[in-house]
């Protein structure tokens, strides 16, 4: 007997068969329509009833990944994650090992595949020029994580008896030092910035530890900057959504998952849509308290928006956004990025990306709070505290110098002679 299971935009025929060794296996076959799935189900049942069922040919990596994306990816991933995984498969996996039968895979072959990827040129994705000419160990690690999970699913579905990359060795990745501004540089950038949008973005990103999409997705109903709140230091913003541009096919494939609002297109055509969506994790939904200075900036921005609304009337596209164009349309990340690059170029500032302000924020909040990881995690929205400690527990040079000085003062200056020691027994 076979059964049909509906999976989002596909239909899976699930059945069991016995191989030539007499061992029973389960198999999933994916089809785009219910009619095709029913046709295949009837064929399987007819052949099994008449003892003419042919044992399925060995599946290839490409066929497995189709099922993996349809059954696992569609149900588990956010739109940006689905798109990123799909790019890895189409650009770096299928062209090289896509046609290899699963039964032929072994750990040695997969380790050689990972080494060969170091010689593969990086692809241009979404019109973005890659940072490196060839694939880096960090990108190969992403490929490995995807394949490890896909092969685990294959074992679960009984397509494979073992995972060939479970213990595979991958190219060693050198830790990459994050480029970020120290506090004096950040303060200098604020003084030099004469772009109102960028100035507010810099202040919010640093003081509230925000991701770009979270900041651009802030709506006025998620802000409390009343005079009373500002005065007693409890003004806040509530992060519950983010602005993101996603591919239309992924948007439809995932059935608009996590999407709160779809912005109307300015121009006809196009293969992307701009949306407000749920943040990446539940812990990303959070209340972040504003410093008084920043709260006053936000309050002034709200007043400016109200004046523009009254001036333009019906010509203003009111989406209730804190960051918007002069006509109310959403402000996308590239506008802030271009303004930041101009500020850096015009004033010979250290070259950093906008996301680095989040790293700077976390670093200094850890420093100022004496390492209060939970408090910093509350602002950053990281899912686990260890994500903060692993990525941001580095100490600024000035603190390291101070630590050495403290050791000198507390230990060696109080021990005038190394021969005059007291032994403490515990």
Per-region residue spans from a language model:
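Catalytic-site neighborhood detector that most strongly recognizes the C-terminal catalytic loop/helix
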Residues: 172, 180, 231-234, 241-245, ...
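N-terminal DNA-binding module of tyrosine recombinases/phage integrases
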Residues: 7-112, 303-317, 397
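N-terminal core-binding DNA-recognition domain of tyrosine site-specific recombinases/integrases
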Residues: 2-3, 17, 70-157, 175, ...
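Short, polar N-cap/turn motifs at the start of nucleic acid-interacting alpha helices
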Residues: 222-231, 350-351, 370-393, 420
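C-terminal secondary-structure termini that scaffold catalytic or DNA-interacting sites
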Residues: 222-236, 241-282, 294, 405-426
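Basic, Lys/Arg- and aromatic-enriched nucleic-acid-binding interface segment
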Residues: 126, 133-137, 141, 156, ...
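Active-site/catalytic core of tyrosine-dependent DNA strand-transfer enzymes
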Residues: 17, 265-275, 279-349
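C-terminal catalytic core of tyrosine-transesterase DNA break-rejoin enzymes
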Residues: 156, 203, 207, 214, ...
């Amino acid at each position: 007997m076979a059964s049909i299971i509906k999976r989002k935009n596909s239909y899976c025929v699930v059945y069991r068969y016995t191989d030539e060794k007499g061992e029973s296996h389960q198999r999933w076959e994916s089809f785009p329509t219910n009619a095709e799935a029913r046709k295949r189900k009837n064929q399987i049942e007819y052949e099994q009833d008449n003892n003419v069922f042919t044992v399925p040919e060995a599946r290839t990596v490409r066929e497995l990944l189709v099922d993996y994306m349809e059954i696992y990816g569609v149900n588990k991933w956010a739109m940006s994650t689905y798109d990123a995984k799909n790019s890895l498969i189409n650009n770096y996996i299928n062209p090289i090992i896509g046609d290899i039968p699963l039964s032929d895979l072994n750990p040695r072959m997969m380790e050689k595949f990972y080494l060969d990827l170091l010689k593969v040129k990086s692809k241009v994705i979404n019109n973005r020029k890659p940072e490196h000419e060839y694939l880096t160990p960090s990108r190969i690690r992403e490929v490995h994580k995807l394949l490890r999970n896909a092969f685990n699913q294959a074992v679960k579905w009984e397509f494979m008896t073992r995972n060939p990359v479970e213990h595979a060795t991958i190219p060693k990745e050198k830790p990459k030092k994050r480029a970020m501004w120290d506090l004096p540089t950040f303060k200098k950038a604020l003084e030099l910035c004469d772009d109102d949008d960028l100035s507010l973005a810099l202040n919010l990103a640093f003081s509230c530890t925000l991701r770009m999409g979270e900041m651009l997705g802030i709506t006025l109903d998620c802000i409390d900057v009343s005079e009373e709140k500002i005065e007693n230091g409890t003004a806040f913003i509530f992060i519950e959504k983010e602005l993101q541009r996603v591919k239309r096919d992924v948007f439809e494939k995932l059935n608009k998952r996590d999407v709160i609002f779809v912005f109307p297109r300015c121009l006809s055509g196009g293969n992307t849509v701009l949306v407000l969506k749920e943040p990446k994790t539940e812990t990303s939904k959070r209340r972040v308290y504003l410093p008084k200075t920043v709260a006053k900036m936000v309050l002034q921005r709200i007043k400016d928006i109200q004046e523009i609304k009254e001036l333009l009337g019906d010509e203003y596209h009111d989406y209730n956004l804190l960051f918007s164009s002069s006509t109310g349309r959403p402000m996308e990340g590239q506008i802030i990025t271009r303004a930041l690059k101009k500020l850096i170029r015009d004033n010979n500032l250290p070259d950093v990306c906008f996301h680095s302000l989040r790293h700077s924020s976390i670093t200094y909040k850890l420093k100022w709070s004496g390492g209060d990881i939970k408090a910093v995690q509350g602002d950053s929205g990281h899912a686990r505290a260890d994500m903060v400690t692993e990525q941001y527990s580095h100490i600024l040079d000035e603190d390291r110098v101070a630590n050495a000085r403290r050791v000198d003062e507390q230990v060696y200056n109080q021990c005038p002679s190394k021969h005059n020691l007291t032994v403490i027994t515990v």
